[in-house]
Design a protein with these regions (language model features):
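Helix-helix packing/entry segments at the starts of transmembrane helices
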Residues: 15, 41, 100-107, 176-195, ...
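Hydrophobic/aromatic residues within transmembrane alpha-helices
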Residues: 29, 38, 42, 92, ...
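Hydrophobic transmembrane alpha-helices of multi-pass small-molecule transport proteins
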Residues: 50, 115, 124-146, 257, ...
Length: 294
């Protein structure tokens, strides 16, 4: 693929814009569906998009070979994403204000550096510890709305689930380091494995229902713009980029843009502690990113 920085930035900005809308979309969708139902229907839409994408670009023929080469790895990945990760994440969004849940979700990169120590044998440097302290201080500020000395959490379970989702996502990426298959092929296989697990749990809980039109639209939006199209746009941005660092830095726009959508469409009053805490989280991520780029 020919490199083109302008095209890369356009792809990246499109992805960032769409990712910035999903926190709002999650909350709107959860007004229509339970977290488990949303995981299933959104994953189904994402699976359909990925299947069509692979058929169009000719990569569908490699799916079977990729799966058979490492079935146990794909089983682990598929259980993690979409099944466990999104189920836990959507439950966190169900319990927390969108502004809190989306901010806490951005700490997954810090969770990744923590898990990489025991699982990949990496060392935790002083800069990693500094990044960790900044990020989790931000988590504390957001979770307690600035009253962190009192440790008065609005929803301890919601905060716990949001942080657990970051560990699950970090775990997914650590397992993915062993995978050399094309990203879209890998993601399609994961969704092909994850969907039956979600369906089994839905059946076990007798939670099937025919969605309303609003619920279908909400699930389609989440499936396409959180799990499907946006992922492909970001991959295109990385492939087109002449300077990947400058393109990948655009992701830092997303959490703040997301707050605008949350305020506009959900009517949530953005608490000052959310902005301050998010600033600490972004500082932590920036420290981590700057050190890795050296």
């Amino acid at each position: 693929m020919l490199k083109n920085q302008k095209h890369a930035i356009l792809y990246a900005l499109s992805a960032v814009f769409l990712w910035s809308t999903v926190a709002t979309a999650f909350k709107l969708a959860l007004m229509q569906l339970t977290p488990l139902q949303l995981v299933f229907y959104a994953s189904a839409f994402s699976w359909l998009f990925l299947a069509i994408f692979l058929l169009v670009n000719g990569d569908y023929q490699y799916v079977k070979t990729a799966f058979l080469s490492k079935p146990l790895l794909y089983l682990k990945l598929g259980v993690l994403n979409p099944f466990l990760y999104y189920l836990i994440l959507f439950k966190a969004y169900d319990l927390l204000p969108a502004q809190q849940a989306q901010a806490l979700n951005y700490t997954w990169a810090i969770a990744l550096s923590l898990l990489a120590v025991p699982m990949l044998g990496q060392r935790l440097r002083k800069t990693d510890i500094a990044a960790l302290m900044f990020a989790y201080l931000g988590v504390l500020i957001i979770s307690t709305k600035g009253q962190f000395t009192e440790l008065n959490f609005e929803s301890p379970l919601g905060v716990g689930l949001a942080l657990l989702s970051t560990l699950l996502w970090a775990l997914y990426w650590i397992f993915s380091t062993k995978n050399t298959d094309k990203p879209v092929i890998s993601l399609f296989i994961c969704f092909s494995i994850g969907l039956p697990f979600i369906a089994l749990v839905l059946s076990w809980q007798n939670a099937w229902q025919i969605p309303t039109v609003k619920a279908w639209l909400a699930a389609a939006y989440v499936g396409l713009f959180e799990m499907g199209i946006t992922f492909v746009l970001w991959l295109m941005a990385m492939k087109k980029a002449e300077n990947t660092a400058s393109v990948s830095n655009l992701i830092f726009i997303s959490p703040f843009l997301s707050l605008i959508f949350i305020f506009t469409f959900l009517g949530e009053a953005i608490h000052p502690a959310t902005i301050i805490g998010l600033g600490f989280i972004i500082c932590g991520l920036a420290i981590q990113k700057l050190i890795k780029s050296k």
